[in-house]
Amino acid sequence: MTAQKSKYFNRIMTMNTLLFSLLTVGFSQAYADVVLEKQVKITDDGLHFDGKDLNHGNIDSADPGEKYDFFFGPNISAHGDAVKTYKHYVFMTWYKGGKSERNVMLSRYNTQTQTIATIEFPHRHTGFRGNPLIGESHNTIGLAVSPNNGTIHMVYDLHAYDDNNHDGKFKDDFFRYSFSVENAADLPDDQFTLDKFVKDTSSISQGPDDYKHISMTGDIADKSNFARLTYPKFFTTTDGTLLLYMRLGGNNNGAYVFNRYDEETQTWSKFTKFNENNQKNFGNPYNWGLYGNMKYVNGKLRVGFQQRSSDNNDRYQYQNGVYYAYSDHPEGFGDWKNHKDDEITYPLVNSDEIKVLEPGDYISHQEANSVYIVGSFDWTVTKKGDVHFISKVRSTNRSRPDYEEEYLHSYKPAGADEFITTTDFTGASQIYTAGDNIYIVGLKNGRPYVERAKGGTNDFVRVYEATSGPVFDHGTLYIKDGKVYYYLMEKTSGNAMPLYLQIIDLDLESEANAPQVAFPSTSLTVEQGYEQLSLGIDATSSIEGRTIESVTLYLNDELVRTDTTVPYLFGHASKPHETGAMGWKDEHEPNPNPLGPGEHIFKAVAVDSEGDTGLATMRLTVQSNAPMVSFPTQLIEVDEGYEKLSVSVDASSSVEGRTIESVTLFINGEEVRTDTTIPYLWGHGSKPHETGAMGWREDHAPNPNPFLAGEYVFTAIATDSQGEQSETSMTLIVNGEATPPIVTWPNEVVTVTEGYKRLGITIEAEASSENATIESVTLYRNDELVRVDTKYKWNFGHSFAPYEFGAMGWLETHEPNPSPLLAGTHTFKVVAKDSTGLEGEAFMTLIVLPPAGPSISFDEPDIELMTGYESLSVSTYVATVNESVDIISVALFIDDVLVRENLEAPYVWGDANHPNELLSLEVGSYEFKAIARDTNDQVSEVSLLVSITLFGDFDGDNDVDRTDVRAFSSAIRSGEALDQRYDFNEDGVVDRSDTRGLTKICSRPRCAS
């Protein structure tokens, strides 16, 4: 769909007389006071990454010393879903600094007693892909407290891990979930301790002090449901149910998944997908990932995101679009709809079903990868149902001469059919809601500020800004019951920095009773010297019985006047100057202090009969009467030794009767010459050297001081007949001797496995001079010519030339490469040649590894069963070494006897289609072996031990006799948990009355005696 577009422009008033009546369309909502209620320091030792921002090219150079290098970003504490409230407590998660500590921490602040209790967990941040020398900012700690049973829940320190990736470093530890016993959240400070959290005592526990659980269901057999997840975020529904959402998969092939907490069983459900990943498998033309959030707002589970497509040849460098959906199911398990309330496919496959708008439409670029839509994206929904998105779009290349950038605010007021999109928005990274308002909360010069607007509008007003106190580096926040809980890290130094909590009261209660105040418009533009500006203020109370006592007007925070009678009119004929106007009647003396050029803020404060106040603001822009002056262009580039440069200046006055007296040119602050006649021209034939040129006519002597390579700022100052001045600037870049093209590989080192099917690489090549173009890019392999490419894009190894990097080929039309690259190290060189004949080169190392077999693991731990068992199934997780290799089959053997060979996933035995194939095993131990074979003919295997014991054999002697009967009776008396199969009399419990049933299966006579 096409969203409604609306670009807002201030109205420029060309007449000198203005009269604003109460009928003028426009509105600015009244607001009560927003105040900092409390600030408290939580710790001095929050972990922060203070080293280098690494990438895949220098990942092996991490600092082993004190500096903490990082991947993705420097923030990990006061980051992510790290602050929540429960009753009168505020809970905060963080990692302990410095670099050698890294423990997971949980702090609880009691707002009544002002005390802080902190728990230190044994787990330490494992670092980027398991390297503790490199911090990873994505490994945040998600936090929730159940309002229904006081349990605390944390998911942390993970980024799409599973048993097999990153060299198996996260085997049996790829998901980290910790939870407390009931009512731990309320305990006194001295009892708020680590032992209130439940240890992992499963067969894959990491040790006696392991508080991390790999599954949230309570069953480690479900662990595969918790693999490859990132970005934990908890929600609380209107009835107190906890939900958790995470991202499954990667950047351009992912899904949002969520699950639910059951207070009765104190376990969580398995994850449910909002959308499918691997969307091509479900008929979509491409795979896509999500960059945004799932949120529970206004009583519903919702999603809002930008899409990152696997199509790398569209005009978007990374993300595109704005997408939105919501669920009418109380916990999101179905009934999903788009913003038009149309039902959508669930799980979602085609994202176009929920597309709202395309930010890329707000700039003009159409070339491949020319549009950049990353960052400054968020969304929210108000209590009454206004939907708001903020986003940013810009040119990918910041250096291009036609660079474009727009901040967008797209909103759909409750009850509206379409979204309104405005570029009259200064931008933000997050947007929040409380009640019917929307908020922007952030840091300015390191201190918090709050801006607020009524939902369904773009009328943002700054209602709070701190001007003193600590200077902060970053923070994350949570809004609850009209208060902002802003969790912040102070900007100091090192890898252990202080953490603070600020509680900011949004004063929603007072706002509900506050008078409603409105200017005729939220903004206005006038010309300098305007004669009349009459402002009628509308002030009313929505509370029955209340009246407006007064309206006070302020101009730039200076008191103008208080009016106590309707109409509340300022700048009328008796007081023409109070709004900055000159005056318009014959009896009006000219204003001795008119408003000068620039922006000015009018503020109206209304007081009602109960003393409650409301305010509104209006921005007035006064345009200057100074001359208008401009160069033809803002940037000129020439080559060193240029012969001619004539520079003209356009200067005029917008005020009738005024003329331009002179224009003076300065270069790098040094005066060149003043010109008093049109055209205002420098560097003409009579003065060829004044702009740094050599001269171009035979009668021109060579310039003894020509401009050398560098940057020069030309400034023109125009003066009009009233002595008013304006200036403008232009930059001249003098290029030195031409430099060769810049050519780069996406990665300087690429590693593949022998037999790889596909390797295509696009080379970046750019001429150093703006006047030159790239004519060709030539590829060499181990110093042998591969191909000369003369057409952009510089793409090698594509489907029409699949063998250029030694690959086998991947399409049905590709014959197998007769000379593939074998295991070893190979050097590739590209040479870019520009239109001036200059050449630049770059090298790439291709490492071909010997073929590796697939990775395979059983999804189950070792199994123990008793004879007579009724069901048994096992499954394997199998992955190839890379996407170019496929699995041919997985076969299961029991003690080297083939059970069945599976030719396609899922690789399960004993499933519904083959329920009996693993039954009837006799007493003994069996080796279950799964063997996987891939298209490289590589084989890997994994084994599982299955032990079958005799039903009723308690002493392990392979028969059932009186000794076993006595052992059974003893177990009953001591209260041991026994298998439900021993409930012989089928009364629902295993007790002494079942002893007779055991005697009936004795394998020896006189068993009961």
UniProtKB/Swiss-Prot annotation:
<feature type="binding site">
    <location>
        <position position="200"/>
    </location>
    <ligand>
        <name>Ca(2+) 1</name>
    </ligand>
</feature>
<protein>
    <recommendedName>
        <fullName>Ulvan lyase, long isoform</fullName>
        <ecNumber>4.2.2.-</ecNumber>
    </recommendedName>
</protein>
<keyword id="KW-0456">Lyase</keyword>
<comment type="similarity">
    <text>Belongs to the polysaccharide lyase 24 family.</text>
</comment>
<feature type="site" description="Neutralizes the sugar carboxylate group at subsite +1">
    <location>
        <position position="247"/>
    </location>
</feature>
<feature type="binding site">
    <location>
        <position position="316"/>
    </location>
    <ligand>
        <name>Ca(2+) 2</name>
    </ligand>
</feature>
<feature type="active site" description="Proton donor/acceptor">
    <location>
        <position position="138"/>
    </location>
</feature>
<feature type="binding site">
    <location>
        <position position="311"/>
    </location>
    <ligand>
        <name>Ca(2+) 2</name>
    </ligand>
</feature>
<dbReference type="GO" id="GO:0046872">
    <property type="term" value="F:metal ion binding"/>
</dbReference>
<comment type="function">
    <text>Ulvan lyase involved in ulvan degradation. Ulvan is the main polysaccharide component of the Ulvales (green seaweed) cell wall. It is composed of disaccharide building blocks comprising 3-sulfated rhamnose (Rha3S) linked to D-glucuronic acid (GlcA), L-iduronic acid (IduA), or D-xylose (Xyl). Ulvan lyase catalyzes preferentially the endolytic cleavage of the glycosidic bond between Rha3S and the uronic acid GlcA, but not IduA, producing oligosaccharides that have unsaturated 4-deoxy-L-threo-hex-4-enopyranosiduronic acid (deltaUA) at the non-reducing end.</text>
</comment>
<feature type="binding site">
    <location>
        <position position="372"/>
    </location>
    <ligand>
        <name>substrate</name>
    </ligand>
</feature>
<feature type="binding site">
    <location>
        <position position="314"/>
    </location>
    <ligand>
        <name>Ca(2+) 2</name>
    </ligand>
</feature>
<dbReference type="GO" id="GO:0016829">
    <property type="term" value="F:lyase activity"/>
</dbReference>
<dbReference type="InterPro" id="IPR036439">
    <property type="entry name" value="Dockerin_dom_sf"/>
</dbReference>
<feature type="binding site">
    <location>
        <position position="210"/>
    </location>
    <ligand>
        <name>Ca(2+) 1</name>
    </ligand>
</feature>
<keyword id="KW-0732">Signal</keyword>
<keyword id="KW-0106">Calcium</keyword>
<dbReference type="GO" id="GO:0000272">
    <property type="term" value="P:polysaccharide catabolic process"/>
</dbReference>
<keyword id="KW-0479">Metal-binding</keyword>
<feature type="binding site">
    <location>
        <position position="308"/>
    </location>
    <ligand>
        <name>substrate</name>
    </ligand>
</feature>
<feature type="signal peptide">
    <location>
        <begin position="1"/>
        <end position="32"/>
    </location>
</feature>
<dbReference type="Pfam" id="PF15892">
    <property type="entry name" value="BNR_4"/>
</dbReference>
<feature type="binding site">
    <location>
        <position position="291"/>
    </location>
    <ligand>
        <name>substrate</name>
    </ligand>
</feature>
<dbReference type="InterPro" id="IPR013783">
    <property type="entry name" value="Ig-like_fold"/>
</dbReference>
<feature type="binding site">
    <location>
        <position position="212"/>
    </location>
    <ligand>
        <name>Ca(2+) 1</name>
    </ligand>
</feature>
<feature type="binding site">
    <location>
        <begin position="137"/>
        <end position="138"/>
    </location>
    <ligand>
        <name>substrate</name>
    </ligand>
</feature>
